Amino acid sequence: MEPPLELPTQRKRVIPSKFGILKRNAEIEAEKNRENLQQSSCFSHINEIGKEIGLEIWKIIDDSTIQKVPKVNHSTFETNKSYLLLMGQFYDGNMNIKTYNIHFWIGELLINSQETINFCNDRIEELERIIKYNQKQFDSEQFYPEPILYREFQGKEGDIFMSYFKSYGGPRYVAPLKLTSASAAIATAAKQYKLFHLKGRRNIRVKQVDISSKSLNSGDVFVLDCEDFIYQWNGSESSRLEKGKGLDLTIRLRDEKSAKAKIIVMDENDTDKDHPEFWKRLGGCKDDVQKAEQGGDDFAYEKKSVEQIKLYQVENLNYEVHLHLIDPIGDVYSTTQLNAEFCYILDCETELYVWLGKASANDQRTVAMANAMDLLHEDNRPSWTPIIKMTQGSENTLFKDKFKKGSWGEYVNDNFEKKPITGKGVAAKAVQEKINVDALHNPEKYQLSKEERKSTIPTLHHVDDKHRGELKIWHVRNRNKFEISQSEFGLFYNQSCYLVLFTLFAADGSNNSILYYWQGRFSSSEDKGAAALLAKDVGKELHRSCIHVRTVQNKEPNHFLEHFQGRMVVFKGSRPNATTEVSLENLSSSLQGLYHVRGTEPINIHSIQVEKAISSLDSNDSFILVNFKNTISYIWVGKYSDEKEAALQISSNVFTGYNFQLIDEGDETSEFWESLETNSSLSLLKDYYTQLRTVEQEKKTRLFQCSNNSGVFKVFEIHDFSQDDLDSDDVMILDNQKQIFVWVGKESSDTEKLMANETALEYIMNAPTHRRDDPIFTIQDGFEPHEFTFNFHAWQVNKTQQDSYKSKLSAILGSNNSGPASPIMLPTSGVTLKPTTAATPKPITTPTVTTPKPITTPTVATLKTVTPAVTLKPTTVTTPSKVATTTNTSTPSPTTITTFYPLSVLKQKTNLPNDIDKSCLHLYLSDEEFLSTFKMTKEIFQKTPAWKTKQLRVDNGLF
């Protein structure tokens, strides 16, 4: 008999919710998409692509193989290959959203290969799909900007592409090696020398050239890589920027060889005997070097030609594609002509932009790219012309610059006239527009765009600083962070970076955090980058809302300063020890110096260490002079200063244990001057800024940057400025409501100098208040007088006088003593490092005049040109700290004059004896009468700034 059938035990069936089913289905679909993408993709590890911030590069080996390039070779490009580049960055300061630029780069040997270009087009679109897929997997509901696509060709790369390789000295082009086997490749690479040519004005390009002495020219820099030795050859007319980038390249080459190669820096003026090995390896001699003209113009070599600009609207109607040419509004296009429902092609002759409206259809986007490719092949356009695709809301600065300023983001759907293409339209050539000085005086009236404002200081108006919270600070060094103790809070170093985390506790128990990553003024690029990355890591560890604020020294917002309650001091140098606590007791010997105090309330009190010199003083501020503990230190209060209480607060909070004496300006003792200035002759001069600067004047002091680097002269204001905003490539205009300064950068062009002077004149003539009698001073980069420098907090005297190439070289030479490897070798015999003739300043041969020379504008001014009678350029310059007059070789000196005359005779100015030089009447006074008249000796008078001596001579009738 069969056993009874056992029924299975019934179980409750769990029915998943509708949302659970949808979620699971979405996960299954995403997994299928990932597998399909992985199987069809030429890229490996697609889940890792774009995960980290920074640059990723792939080399295209053939039509089916793509190889990722290690970071050590990121700046090297083979001229017979093509590359794909992906740059990930944070979007608009938001650490949770990334934006991507995708480039494909074609070497010069493949420029005419249409197959390669088509393959790169496919791969760049594939990379775009991978990025979008990974973004969706991270957060499907989050808005992500569309990746921007670029085409690049060797030697014609855009500014964005070039910016990725500034730290490498620019991209390096390498010719392909003709090898027969792998072993031969290794042997040949070890023996082959390479010669690199560096050229450009702002974006230095590096190109491999023929190894021959005839490849050298006097206007550029060349680097010869011989594996065991790396030679940098500086042409006599090469720029300091080219030499600095050359040094970056040589160090990069050395690091690729594990620091085994030795670097030798040489100049064209060195003889063949100084560097025999260099000429032996290069082949030839010094006589083969070409003139600078043979290398071509730097600006022409680098600058892209921006010619006619046309805007097309793409329409796909009834399977027919139409391109409609849109007329500009006036001379330029406006974003009000862009409709979110359509796609557009912006044709700039040497650039093609494809703009995709957010509401445009997919088929319209496809035909827009296809039509851009068609335009690319018309009119014999250069093969290196890039096609850049971008979506509404993710436009880059280069694209925005093509449209009317102030209109960006004003998208409307109004109808506008569209003209079908019937022929080749010719757009009007771009012309220089007159600078609107009324917009400079009244920026709110014209609603200047963010690009023109160029404000670099972060603002957090929504942060409530009234609540107290928890403060943590880390010091950044060697890519790691080290937490510091509370006793060190508020003490910073200008060569270091810090993370400052402030947590706000609300009454309801919730909390929010603000994370500042503070960058010292002279901190290294490595520490700055590490601070940004470590800030990202700290934000992730918090697991809550966190605002990230990049904070630069001298541009700290009040909500940052308030955390330290009058205890913030910035010292010179770097923090002595990374891992252990820094005690002020242990640092007492290194604290000696002069500290400039600013701030009148706890929320803005701070102090910065400045040069210990009398010239650093300012009657409008207070200073702390710290000496040894067993001696007297001083708190010096200027006669117009409001910072007395702030200086007392910092001295008691920070410099504890020191014996301070409070001194008002005018009551200084001889001991004070001697401890401040070791040079006894300068201590007698007491040369510093003594004029009144009102609070209203401080608030209204404004700085404008004048630049012609885009081909059109532009003027824009820099808000919350500091000394670091002075760009040696441009001309700056400073208005402190009393006078106008035209600051001329060392590398500024003649056009910038001329038009900046014209702009300054128009600016003063069109001021809302009567300012026609205000003087205009023209001063040179590196020779700023006190009247100019007092407008900047903690002016660094030597900063503008430093040569970037020399300072960089000095820094590397200084690291020889502490670093494991020797970056630069200076042989003891036969090889020396000499300055080029280009770096030697030309002697001044103009007559002695005042410096700087004020300009009193006439009642009726010329608005377009500067009349010859108005001399804006000074004929002499003086150093800011230790001023000396510049004399003509024909002008008598006090030691050469033997005949003296009384003051009454010299004041007549007519019927003077024939042996008197009227340009220096004061020198013909006897020593006794000179001292009685000017209250100083002739020797001290000669060392007094020219602007002071002029006024003294005028007051006594001897000018």
Swiss-Prot record:
Domain HP: from-to ranges: 895-959
Gelsolin-like repeats: 64-116, 204-244, 309-366, 479-529, 603-647, 713-754
Region listing for 2 X 10 AA repeats of T-P-K-P-I-T-T-P-T-V, in residue ranges: 840-860
Region spans: Core: 54-832
Recorded GO MF terms: actin filament binding; actin monomer binding; phosphatidylinositol-4,5-bisphosphate binding
Subcellular compartments: Cytoplasm, Cytoskeleton
Biological process (GO), any one: actin polymerization or depolymerization
Ranges of the Sequence repeats in the UniProt entry: 840-849, 851-860
Keywords: Actin capping, Actin-binding, Cytoplasm, Cytoskeleton, Repeat
Gene Ontology cellular component annotations, sorted alphabetically: actin cytoskeleton; cytoplasm
CDD domains for the chain: gelsolin_S2_like, gelsolin_S3_like, gelsolin_S4_like, gelsolin_S5_like, gelsolin_S6_like
Gene3D superfamilies for the chain: Severin (3.40.20.10), Villin headpiece domain (1.10.950.10)
Pfam (any one): Gelsolin
Region (Tail): 1-53
Cited PANTHER family: PROTOVILLIN (PTHR11977:SF31), VILLIN (PTHR11977)
Similarity-based family: Belongs to the villin/gelsolin family.
Annotated function: Caps actin filaments but displays neither severing nor cross-linking nor nucleating activities. Protovillin seems to be a villin precursor with only archaic capping activity. It lacks essential changes in the sequence to allow bundling of actin filaments and consequently the appearance of microvilli.
Protein name listed in UniProt: Protovillin
Organism: Dictyostelium discoideum (Social amoeba)
